[in-house]
């Protein structure tokens, strides 16, 4: 109300790295129940603020939660056998929560706009060598396009899906998941942009080594 009083248009981020402690203690985004809890939370937000807030961000920098969660303190690796698999399981649940929240926003607050807020970084090949160009394309898919393809089109990026297969990190896809993912359509993409990146092929392994 104070923002509107002074002519400031509020832009609300629904989730910014921190879960309620009760949910975190139950496993957080690693459990599907967290997806349902987020949708209930979204409903409360839209019911109470939808008449005044017209712009919503779903999950802040979801790709950072997945790519560097252990480094930024949003994921505890203790006792986790396959860290990659657990991170991408959490990511799948967040994607479901985001899609359902976007669909709910359009249903409950038709005039509102909602979208994701990934951390996007332009990725350049370290040289003009074909293998470095390939490495840059793969890293960009893992770093950027995976999250954009899912948010906008509701599908898994094929390059990243293949990467997850190789890493034994594929998430569990339950019946109805892909329909949920396809039902959420963003009105915009909010990009948090801090830096560019380069990528080169690791000659020792002949695999893409993001730098």
What residue spans do the PLM features occupy?
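Active-site region of glycoside hydrolase catalytic domains
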Residues: 4-211
């Amino acid at each position: 109300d104070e923002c509107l009083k002074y002519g400031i248009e509020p832009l609300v981020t629904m989730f910014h790295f921190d879960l309620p402690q009760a949910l975190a203690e139950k496993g957080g985004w690693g459990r599907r129940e967290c997806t349902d809890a987020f949708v209930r939370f979204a409903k409360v937000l839209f019911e109470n603020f939808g008449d005044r807030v017209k712009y919503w961000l779903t999950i802040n920098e979801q790709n950072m939660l997945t790519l560097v969660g252990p480094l930024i303190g949003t994921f505890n690796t203790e006792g986790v056998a396959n860290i990659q698999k657990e991170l991408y399981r959490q990511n799948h649940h967040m994607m479901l929560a985001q899609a359902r929240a976007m669909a709910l926003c359009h249903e409950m607050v038709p005039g509102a706009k909602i979208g994701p807020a990934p951390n996007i970084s332009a990725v350049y090949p370290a040289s003009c060598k074909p293998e470095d160009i390939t490495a840059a394309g793969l890293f960009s898919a893992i770093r950027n396009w995976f999250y954009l393809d899912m948010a906008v089109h509701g599908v898994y990026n094929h390059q990243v899906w293949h990467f997850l297969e190789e890493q034994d990190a594929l998430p569990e896809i339950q019946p109805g998941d892909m329909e949920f993912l396809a039902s959420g359509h963003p009105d915009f993409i909010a990009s948090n942009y801090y830096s560019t990146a380069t990528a080169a092929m690791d000659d020792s392994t002949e695999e893409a080594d993001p730098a």
